[in-house]
Structure formats: C-alpha cells, structure tokens
C-alpha cells in the first residue's frame, strides 16, 4: 500500500518469489527502508530532520509548545529546548512490547537471562535450533514465529492459542502445523523451568518463551494528553492500509495547520467519538479501521478538501482495488502456511 504518488519499487527477493510466486506483493524490509529514506531525502527534506535525537518532554507554554530534546554524546548527553506553534505526534504504536503478567516469568528471566523475549527482538530461527520453545500469542507475529521454528526448534513448538481469539485476517491456520502443539494460557512457571497451563498440562525444561502479544501505546514525552487544536496525531490507527492511511491523515493535518481546511465544531467531533465508542468500545477496537476502509478514507478526504486554490496534494477517491489487494495478500500468506502444513504432514509419513 504505497503513497498515492510514490510507488513502492518493484524489487522482489528470491525467498518471496519462491514462497508466493513471481508476482509476490511482499517486499524485503531493506526495500521498504530505502523507500522511506528516499522519500525523506528528496528535495532536501532531510535538512528538516534531527537524527539520533529523542523527544523527552512536550508541554504547552502560553501559545507555544516547548519541546525538550536530548542527543547522546561521547562523554555526556546534550539537552536543549525548542519552541513550536504546533506538534504532530507520529511516533507510531509498535515500539513498547506488551508482555502479560505471568507468575514466575520474571524469576525465570533472572535465572536464565535471555530466555524471555518479545517478537520485536526475534531475529531468526537459528538461535532456537534444538531448543524447547513456548510461543505466546494468537495473532500474526506469534503465528509467523511458531511456523518459522517448526522443524528447527525441539518438536513440538508449544503455541499458547487455545481460548484466545484468532486474528481476524489470518485465523488459526498457521498453528495447525504438525510440529506445533496448541496450548491453553499459562497459569504459572516454576523454578525448574516448567511452564504450567491452565488446563493442568505442562512443559518441562523450557529454554525460551517468545511473546507475540502486541504492543502498549506509549507517549512518555507527553505527560498529559492535551486538548489543544495545535496538537495532532498521525498514524494512531490499526489495520488501516499502511502507508496510504498515513498520507490521508498527514494531508488533513497539514491543511488544518496551514488554515486550508477546518474541522467541524467541537460538539460534532465529540459526537464522532461517542458514536465510535458505542460501536467499537474504548479499547483496541476503537483505533481499528477494518473493515470500514472506504468510509474512513472518504471522510478524511472530504475533510481535507482540495486545498485553497488547488495547492497541495490532491487525494484520490478510495478504490476497492486497494482493499482487494490488502485481503489478497493475507490469502497468499494463509496459502503458504497451508502448504507448509501439508509438507510437514507428508514429512511425518
């Protein structure tokens, strides 16, 4: 899902072609990294970026925002402050791993440092070859890792998925591999490295527990969510057709700050929020765009408008083909898992 005027390069890895065919829609992470880097560097945009810098705090002072910044130095860190008329928070929400509380988990990590990790830290199967592994999570990260370890880690790979809701796109097909054993939630872990499950089952001498349990929303630099018209958030959504949804939001945010677009009265915005909470709840479902892609994209496009005197990027109308391609990619992934499952079953004959 590229930006509307900047197509993603047609560079496909040998692995992706072998797995999904010559028309594979998937790209290696290095291709995506270069895609984003090239966008920043064109037209001198990189001159507006302060690299290797953390935002430590944002707070409103009068009619401006005070930003406290920090850059690491060889002997000491350099701290400074700058002032801005507006702030756009576009820091994402896949940074701080979420690991649920499990009795004995912290003790296991203290006893065997490195035995507990999150999918964010997973860098391939070789570190787990011949190891006894438990994978926790019922969504795509846990599925990818469990399948990747099947036939490499000690068999079976134990996947904590039973009793948990499967990912709406992928279901539970990945966990049906013959080298994966589905388990219920972990009740506790004892000092002998035994993982106990809620149904009374257990796995002894566990080497690693890998969590594919998502991320926590974190804004440590913003001590309180300010209700201020000059504080905007871009990308605070889930399941929303990356990168297009970021583009739509960014265009709207830029036009609001430039005075070329206006939001409706506050009362109407509050009604939007109330209606969405009533329909989706105030948890993770609140931020999910799926399956209402067209309604969301067209609402944002209408709010952004064409800009004053045609200035700025013109957002195209939502195309059903975008959604179809999005879903087709998921079907390719499921087809790959089914093929691997079948190969695994044949290997056991």
Each predicted region: which residue ranges?
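FAD-binding beta-loop-beta segment adjacent to the flavin cofactor pocket
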Residues: 1, 102-109, 218-231, 240, ...
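Feature captures the FAD/FMN-dependent oxidoreductase FAD-binding
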Residues: 14-86, 91
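A conserved short coil-to-beta-strand element within the FAD-binding core of flavoproteins
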Residues: 51-66, 70-72, 101, 121-122, ...
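C-terminal, flexible cofactor-proximal segment of oxidoreductases
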Residues: 230-349
């Amino acid at each position: 899902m590229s930006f509307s005027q900047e197509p993603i390069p047609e560079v496909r890895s040998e692995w992706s072609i072998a797995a999904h065919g010559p028309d594979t829609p998937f790209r290696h992470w290095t291709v995506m990294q270069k895609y984003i880097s090239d966008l920043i560097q064109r037209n001198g945009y990189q001159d507006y970026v302060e690299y290797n810098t953390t935002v430590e705090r944002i707070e409103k002072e009068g009619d401006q925002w005070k930003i406290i910044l920090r850059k690491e130095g060889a002997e000491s860190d350099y701290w400074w402050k700058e002032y801005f008329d507006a702030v756009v928070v576009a820091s994402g929400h896949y940074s701080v791993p979420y690991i649920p509380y499990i009795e004995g988990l912290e003790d296991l990590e203290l006893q065997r440092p490195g035995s507990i990790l999150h999918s964010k830290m997973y860098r391939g199967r070789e570190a787990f070859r011949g190891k006894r592994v438990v994978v926790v999570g019922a969504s795509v990260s846990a599925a990818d890792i469990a399948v990747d370890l099947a036939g490499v880690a000690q068999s079976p790979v134990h996947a904590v998925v039973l009793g948990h809701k499967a990912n709406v796109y992928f279901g539970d097909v990945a966990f049906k591999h013959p080298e994966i054993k589905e388990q219920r939630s972990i009740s506790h872990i004892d000092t002998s490295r035994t993982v106990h499950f809620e149904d009374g089952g257990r796995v002894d001498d566990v080497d690693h527990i890998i969590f594919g349990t998502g991320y926590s929303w974190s804004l440590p630099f913003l001590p309180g969510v300010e209700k201020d018209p000059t504080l905007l958030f871009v990308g605070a959504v889930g399941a929303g057709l990356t990168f297009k949804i970021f583009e739509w939001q960014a265009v709207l945010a830029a036009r609001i700050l430039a005075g070329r677009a206006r939001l409706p009265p506050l009362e109407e915005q509050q009604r939007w929020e109330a209606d969405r909470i009533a329909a989706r709840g105030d948890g993770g479902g609140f931020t999910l765009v799926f399956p209402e892609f067209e309604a969301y994209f067209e609402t944002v496009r209408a709010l952004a408008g064409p800009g004053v005197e045609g200035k700025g990027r013109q957002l195209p109308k939502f195309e059903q083909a975008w959604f179809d391609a999005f879903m087709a990619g998921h079907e390719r992934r499921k087809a790959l898992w089914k093929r691997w499952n079948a190969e695994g079953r044949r290997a056991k004959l």
